[in-house]
Amino acid sequence: MIGKECFVMFHSDFEEKLPYSVLTFVALAVFYAIYFGKMLAQKRRGIRTRQIGSWKEKSLHTIELLMSVATLGIVPAQILSIVFGLSCLPGGVRFTGFLIALLGDGIFLAAVLCMRDSWRAGIPAQDKTEIVTTGIYAFSRNPAFLGFDFMYIGVLLLYCNPLTAAFTAFAIVILHLQILQEEKYMAATFGATYLAYRKKVLRYLGRK
């Protein structure tokens, strides 16, 4: 009888965890498929996408290394949360998190498609890239980072616990600091064109 009760409890717990674990893995898989798929496509054309830490300026180098720690470190935290079912939020909030994560996937996809071969992870040390102001960039100056933020927040709502919350907060703060550095680079590289664009479009979402 005890064995049967344990099996029923395990089965019920498994069914409760399974839908959200699957939804979360889907959201994460789509996001990283876009990221690495784009990186691989550019590599085949001789473009080095990942240029994090390639600059020698100490402040920028530090921020980009912290960005690597944040974006790489959050993945095992998310996976551990999924595997052990670490979540303290009700089902409705968790499903909302899934929708937010999917929104992040969509925003990120739109961003990398609009950037075409100008997309880089990190500030390029020597590559010549073009400023993009159309498509989703007409409504956000940093849609790729916005996609990261939405995806991270969505997964946090799916599996809300101190570990995921800490890594999510750290990642979002570091990504914001990276945005500030990239804005300086954009202003120095593209001058009046970027400044005019910055006057029209908000950093994260919306037009002025």
Please describe what each predicted stretch is.
Residues 2-126, 130, 154-208:
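Membrane-anchoring alpha-helices and their flanking helix-loop junctions
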Residues 123-148:
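Active-site-proximal inter-transmembrane loops
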Residues 147-155:
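Hydrophobic, membrane-inserted alpha-helices
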